[in-house]
Amino acid sequence: LYEEAELADERRFEEWLSLFTDDLQYRMPIVRSLAANDIGKEYLTGPLDISWVDEGKPTLAMRVQQLRTGVHWAEEPLSRVTRLITNVRIVEALPSAEEAQEVEASCKFLLYRNRNADNQDTIIGKRVDRMRRAGDSWLIARRTVFLNQPVLLVNTLSFFV
């Protein structure tokens, strides 16, 4: 997870893409502010619910291609992004911890983005990643990003969260 964040920070997007499975599901569900007794329903995570982001690897690859053209209006010049990853925990290992072929990990993140002279954004939240063994390494098969804010306060989502 740290390597993945560093590759994205360094704009090495093609290498970054190689850390995801071909059947990747990358989601950022919308969060709602609800009463305390409805707290378990605050994130819209159902298959038909709307999300800020709901993409697969082909869509991420197209976004990388757009960035590389140099004419992507929302990312020209490219943003400078720093991702801080912390509180990484293994939540589940299948079929067992000793013989894991799939692992679910959660972490907290802070993303800082600067573009041009005075455009800056900060995003904080939690990520849940399902990783799948691929030989001697692990690939991310599913990522769900849970933002801590019900209103998206960034000007654009042209960068990768």
Feature annotation, model-predicted:
Residues 90, 109-113, 130-133:
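Beta-strand elements of well-folded, non-transmembrane domains
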Residues 1-9:
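Short, aromatic-enriched amphipathic alpha-helices that serve as compact interaction elements
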Residues 111-121:
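Short, cysteine-centered beta-strand-loop-beta hairpins and adjacent loop/turn segments enriched
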Residues 98-106, 123-156:
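Short beta-strand edge/turn micro-motifs at domain boundaries
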Residues 22-105:
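A solvent-exposed, acidic/Ser-Thr-rich amphipathic alpha-helical stretch
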Residues 158-161:
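Short hydrophobic/aromatic patches at helix-to-coil boundaries
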Residues 4, 16, 60, 131:
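Hydrophobic pocket/interface hotspot
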